[in-house]
Amino acid sequence: MHIAIIGAAGMVGRKLTQRLVKDGALGGKPIEKFTLIDVFQPEAPAGFSGAVDARAADMSAPGEAEQLVEVRPDVIFHLAAIVSGEAELDFDKGYRINLDGTRYLFDAIRLAHGKDGYKPRVVFTSSIAVFGAPLPYPIPDEFHTTPLTSYGTQKAICELLLSDYSRR
């Protein structure tokens, strides 16, 4: 199995990579290759004997999503994002990274699927920020999104995009 992790140099990306290396498999299938991407150079995981392509790349840059999709990972973990505070301070950067980068990835997958049926499993990390406040506990699946920040809005839009692209 070939696994790609976008946002691999971040805390969650590093922990996910370590856990996958420790487990050695995902869904009962052995992991043979990692493609690790982040705007900062990700480190190759210690203790992994398979192939690793670790590279610095900005998924909101033209062509980057297509390059990832060309290597046909079986599973793509999309963890990359500009967090709430930074997305509020730099409106354009928040939308470029959080929305455009995600849309480029989904569109590259859609186009590849149209060519040869490529259909990876995509795991997208959202945020509690999509719900706004106040929140019930626990938050039920059908709870409506009412984001109060640009970051929450961007994540909510990406959830809708994922749902729409998944139908295609």
What are these regions (language model features)?
Residues 1-26:
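N-terminal Rossmann NAD(P)H-binding glycine-rich loop of SDR-like oxidoreductase domains
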Residues 93-104, 145, 153-154:
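Glycine-rich NAD(P)-binding loop of the Rossmann-fold in SDR/ketoreductase-type enzymes
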Residues 103-149:
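Conserved Rossmann-fold NAD(P)-dependent oxidoreductase catalytic core, especially the SDR/UDP-sugar
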Residues 59-97:
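NAD(P)H-binding glycine-rich loop region in Rossmannoid oxidoreductase-like domains
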Residues 48-61:
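Rossmann-fold cofactor-recognition segment
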Residues 133-135, 148-168:
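Active-site Tyr-X1-5-Lys
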Residues 6, 37, 76-80, 122-128:
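SDR active-site strand-loop-helix element
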